[in-house]
Structures are given as structure tokens and as C-alpha cells.
Amino acid sequence: MFFRNLTLFRFPTTLDFSEIETLLPQVQLKPVGPLEMSSRGFISPFGRDEQDVLSHRLEDFLWLTVGGEDKILPGAVVNDLLERKVAEIEEKEGRRPGGKARKRLKDDLIHELLPRAFVKSSRTDAILDLQHGYIAVNTSSRKSGENVMSEIRGALGSFPALPLNAEVAPRAILTGWIAGEPLPEGLSLGEECEMKDPIEGGAVVKCQHQELRGDEIDKHLEAGKQVTKLALVMDDNLSFVLGDDLVIRKLKFLDGALDQLEHSEGDGARAELDARFALMSAEVRRLFLLLEDALKLSKAEA
């Protein structure tokens, strides 16, 4: 269940989540209808085993999961059938249908195909830290993260969550770290980075599996390139790549964190899941607070 990416948003810590368990069943995922392309709603974080449990709270951490069902209707299939239909009309009537007629034909085909289309299921998990006012979504896509915010907004009626905003330019901070400026306590450089020329359409350099403080990197910095992605390690617990868009990618829990699971109490799948949730939530909080200080992240106003 460990998250692999983090797209973060902030919300006011004054928000009231006391009614969340009552509200979520009203916005639970419904099966996609015969003539619908997609459906979204909340599902159980625990999967099929506990379908009626739509949230999970542990102290100040709240785990929510947005589920989705999408009809798979390949565009190539629709277009192929459309061309056949157009050819039939042309042969029968001696004319090719115009733009509006083709659009109507295409809509009719989609309407006909939808009830028979395969359905693809998906889930997007999120952890809300109610004490510090942030939500971490397990995605590297800002759009997917915004979709989760929209679903929570639909459940609560109002959810003034905003993407992270740094009071200092993230590129400047990342570039400074790779150039030799001291990193925050607990952080160290990894072995991956991406550098870009600041001009639009400028050169992009990607480095992997190499020492990030050396002559080769220095030459790129001297040429004016700026760091847009940087691999970092937090203690011996987490490794990740931080982007100048403030999205955390390639998140990995290391032995320093995983060793703590050996001392968890309780037996069974649910107890193990609780232990992993507690560990992940605590480590993500540590990382967030570290980055909040280093990047001067703005707080959300009520």
C-alpha cells in the first residue's frame, strides 16, 4: 500500500471532518451506467474485503480512496466503424456525409457501442494530515490530484484545498543544493537529476546513477542550467525525486523505515495494513515538514 508518488495540496486545519463517515456513503462509487463513459466516487481503502468502510482514521491521519470505472472504447475502433458507415452511405446515396452528419453518425455509434464496452477500474489513494493541513495523493499527475480534491469537495460541500506554493523558487533551491549549498538536516543527494537551460526550448540534461557533485555537473551549472528534478534521500528511510513542480516521484521506503514494521503489534492482514498506514503517514509527515521549512511552503487560509 506504500505510495509511489506524492502530489500535495494544502487545506486549512480549521476544517471539520467529524461528519465524513456519514457523508461519504452519499458519494460512494456507483457502477458506470450502460450509456455512461465513466463513474467516480469513494470506495473502501481496504478493497473488496470491507466495501462498506469508506475511510480509515488513525489519530490525525485520514485515509480516503477515490475509485473510478471507465468504459474502454478505442478511438481507432470507432473511427473504423465510422468510415465503414460513411462508405455505405456514399455507395447508397452517391454522396459523402458532411461534417455535421459525420458527427451525428459518430455519436450514434458510440451510443450503440457503450453498453458492450469493457470497464476498467481504478483507484487513487490519499492521506489527509488533519493536524498540519495537507493532503498527499498517490499520483504524479496534477489532474488526478485535482480530481480527488473535487470528490472530497463534493462530499464535504466545501474543501478549499490548493496546490503547494513555495515562497522561494524551487529551481533555485534544488540548483543550490547540487551546487554545494548545505541541505536541510536529514536530507542527502541521490544519484539522479534533470537540468534545463532557463530559456524556452533550451537543452535538457538527464543524469542517472552518478555522483551529483563533480566536474561534469559543475560544467552544466556554469553554463547556466538549472535543476528541475533532483533525487534525494531522507535519512535511511525514504528516497525520492523532487521536481520543481513540487511533485514527489519515485518514492521508495527504505530499510530504515521498513525495519520498524518488525516491531508492530497484532496479527492478521488488517493489523499489518494498519502498521503500514501508520508508518507511511508518519514518514510522509516528516518529509512534508522538512520540505515546508526548506522551500518556505505557504499555508492555506481558512
Swiss-Prot record:
Location(s) in or outside the cell: Cytoplasm, Nucleoid
- Gene Ontology terms: cellular component: bacterial nucleoid; cytoplasm
Q: Which InterPro entries match?
A: RdgC
Decide whether keyword Cytoplasm is in the record.
yes
Name the predominant localization: cytoplasm
* An annotated GO BP: DNA recombination
Q: Which domain of life is it from?
A: Bacteria
GO MF terms here are:
double-stranded DNA binding
Cystine connections: none
For this UniProt record, the keywords arranged alphabetically read as follows: Cytoplasm, DNA recombination
Report any Pfam family annotated for this entry: RdgC
Role according to the record: May be involved in recombination.
Q: What family does the entry list?
A: Belongs to the RdgC family.
Please report the name of this protein according to its UniProt entry. Answer: Recombination-associated protein RdgC
